[in-house]
């Protein structure tokens, strides 16, 4: 019976397939094809940019303690008040401001220092071998002397130049002791630095966008982990050009009982308690250090729902007025209930270590636990402009890599375990995490260990020596995508990082670090190779000494003496080999004629008598062998 059922099922499947091939479709075929064509998430296997397989920061957020954060009770109150339709609301018109990467260009030198030690060992043959140990060491301020005057000249040394200064050499050889000689070798990379100034009262800064560095230019020196940067300030005027420019105009809303200004068109909300006006080269700009600085234009009253309802009732009969009022109250109650309930939900679900930004009724925010252990929320701006720098590098702290703003050219640091970056955070700003990452990666490369980088999607990229074939490990986390982000940003496929793109970028990053660490490392040799080299080179060394001795003894007849001696040695060796071969052949013939005792006892008496001459011949054979051995 079961076989019959299986045949029926197979027949049904085949029949359905044939109907599809013949063009027969059900009533929902067109709807299925339409959904597949319009929904980009169905294209994940081929186009991984839409959805859970994007590897880049989704948001840029304010720092935890810069005044932009709202305490959880304040945020909850502002969220609930924004839901009320009877409060006074105003429209705030602003113009966005963008601070571009513009400044005075100066040359900057990044120096990577390696201590290279050679140890010599001379064996009994007189053969000298060299063993090398190379390790990264901190670059000192005195190492600036390795930068020559021609390197500072941009005409002779363009930006992007690489110099290898090698001071290490093989150690001298000594027959009675091993000698170790250590020296410092330098790799010097020429970068472009720019002197920039954000506002009139802000200090002058030096930005090295290639390395994600922003620092005080007056020191002319910066050390981070075991790498250092050197530069010289120009003697002339250091007033940088203006980097501010105006962008799009926005209309934002403000409720008089709240702490927030909400700009729905960009998905960002300002905390009015934390924004301030600063004078710049382009005029007065608000929130100059925030994700979206702006020029204030004007504001006007926003018509309330009650005013809109009153306007709609003008000239209407009583029946229509009652209907309008009823519909208005229903929508107000529905919106208030939904909005307030969502505010309550977000206020109760926060955790201090939240690594993901949340979409709320009043914009996108992230949870933080401030120094006073008071939970708060920080505003965040959805963005698709921040992408991984090419080439990239490891910044401070574990899983921090260099990113760049494609709109302005500024660089920053991204903790890949989070779906956001923080304004103003670059590769040398987080002192708590310094020394745990790039230095650790270099040490891991020296030890031949595996390097792992974890992303906020839960996925991990694992790179094992020789670091040219990364492996992806699929993660399992609750938040792997944020659908609301796609509706808040302008996005195209050229702006996204897929898994293949990340693989290429990080592989190049690790290989560049490997080249810095192991640029002069000797190839390892097995014991077999070492012994072979010592024997061959040792014999050659002994031969050379013998040749020198004979040259001193016989003068111009040295070659003739060496030829005669070589012929004599060859004659002796061939004579010995011939006699050994003769002995071996005698042994083999004797072995073939050997008679076993058990065979002799089983033979008839006449066979025993016939075998006696054979035994006597064996005796003579042994005597002959002994004579040959004596001759040898």
Swiss-Prot record:
Keywords attached to this entry: Glycoprotein, Host-virus interaction, Membrane, Signal, Transmembrane, Transmembrane helix, Viral attachment to host cell, Viral envelope protein, Virion, Virus entry into host cell
Chain positions carrying an annotated carbohydrate: 93, 385, 501, 512, 541
Signal peptide: 1-17
Keyword Nucleotide-binding: no
Transmembrane portions of the chain: 560-578
Main location group: virion
Family as reported in the entry's similarity comment: Belongs to the nucleorhabdovirus glycoprotein family.
Protein known as: Spike glycoprotein
Naturally occurring in which organism (per UniProt): Sonchus yellow net virus
């Amino acid at each position: 019976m079961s076989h019959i059922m299986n045949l029926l099922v197979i027949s049904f499947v085949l029949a359905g397939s044939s109907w599809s091939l013949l063009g027969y479709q059900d009533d929902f075929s067109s709807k299925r094809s339409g959904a597949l064509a319009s929904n980009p998430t169905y294209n994940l296997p081929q186009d991984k940019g839409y959805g859970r397989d994007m590897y880049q920061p989704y948001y840029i957020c304010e720092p935890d303690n810069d005044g932009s954060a709202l305490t959880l009770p304040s945020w909850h109150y502002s969220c609930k008040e924004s839901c009320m339709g009877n409060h006074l609301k105003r429209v705030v018109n602003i113009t966005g401001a963008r601070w571009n990467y513009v400044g005075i260009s100066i040359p900057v030198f990044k120096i990577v220092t390696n201590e290279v030690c050679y140890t010599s060992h001379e064996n009994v043959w007189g053969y000298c071998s060299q063993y090398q140990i190379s390790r990264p060491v901190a670059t000192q301020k005195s190492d600036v002397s390795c930068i020559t005057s021609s390197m500072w000249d941009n005409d002779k040394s363009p930006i992007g130049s690489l110099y290898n200064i090698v001071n290490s050499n093989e150690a001298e050889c000594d027959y009675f002791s091993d000698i170790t000689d250590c020296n410092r070798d330098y790799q010097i990379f020429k970068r472009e630095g720019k002197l920039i100034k954000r506002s009139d009262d802000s200090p002058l800064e030096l930005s090295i966008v290639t390395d994600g560095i922003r620092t005080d230019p007056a020191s002319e020196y910066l050390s981070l982990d075991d790498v250092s940067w050197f530069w010289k300030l120009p003697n002339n005027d250091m007033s940088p050009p203006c980097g501010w420019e105006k962008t799009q105009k926005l209309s934002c809303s403000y409720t008089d009982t709240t702490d927030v200004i909400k700009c729905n068109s960009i998905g960002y909300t300002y905390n009015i308690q934390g924004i301030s006006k600063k004078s710049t080269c382009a005029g007065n700009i608000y929130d100059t250090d925030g994700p979206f600085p702006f020029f204030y234009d004007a504001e006007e009253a926003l018509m309330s729902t009650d005013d809109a309802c009153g306007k709609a009732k003008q000239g209407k009969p009583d029946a229509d007025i009652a209907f309008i009022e009823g519909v208005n109250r229903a929508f107000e109650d529905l919106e208030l209930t939904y909005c307030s309930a969502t505010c309550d939900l977000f206020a109760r679900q926060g955790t201090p270590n939240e690594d993901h930004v949340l979409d709320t009724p009043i914009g996108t925010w992230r949870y933080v636990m401030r120094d006073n252990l008071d939970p708060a929320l920080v505003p965040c701006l959805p963005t698709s402009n921040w992408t991984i720098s090419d080439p990239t590098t490891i910044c401070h702290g574990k899983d921090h890599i260099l990113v760049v703003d494609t709109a302005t050219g500024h660089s920053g640091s991204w903790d890949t375990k989070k779906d956001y970056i923080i304004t103003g955070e670059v590769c040398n700003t987080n002192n708590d995490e310094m020394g745990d990452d790039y230095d650790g990666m270099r040490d891991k490369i020296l030890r031949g260990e595996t390097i792992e980088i974890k992303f906020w999607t839960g996925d991990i990229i694992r790179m094992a020596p020789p670091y040219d074939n990364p492996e992806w490990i699929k993660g399992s986390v609750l938040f792997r995508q944020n659908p609301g982000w796609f509706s808040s940003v302008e996005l195209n496929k050229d702006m996204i990082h897929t898994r293949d793109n990340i693989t290429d970028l990080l592989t190049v990053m690790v290989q560049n670090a490997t080249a810095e660490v192991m640029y002069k490392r000797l190839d390892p040799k097995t014991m077999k190779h070492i012994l072979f080299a010592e024997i061959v080179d040792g014999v050659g060394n002994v031969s050379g000494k013998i040749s020198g001795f004979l040259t001193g003894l016989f003068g111009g007849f040295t070659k003739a003496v060496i030829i005669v001696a070589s012929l004599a040695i060859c004659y002796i060796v061939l004579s010995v080999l011939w006699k050994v071969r003769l002995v071996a052949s005698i042994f083999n013939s004797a072995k073939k004629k050997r008679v076993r005792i058990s065979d002799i006892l089983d033979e008839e008496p006449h066979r025993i008598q016939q075998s006696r001459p054979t035994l006597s011949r064996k005796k003579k054979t042994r005597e002959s062998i002994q004579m040959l051995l004596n001759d040898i």
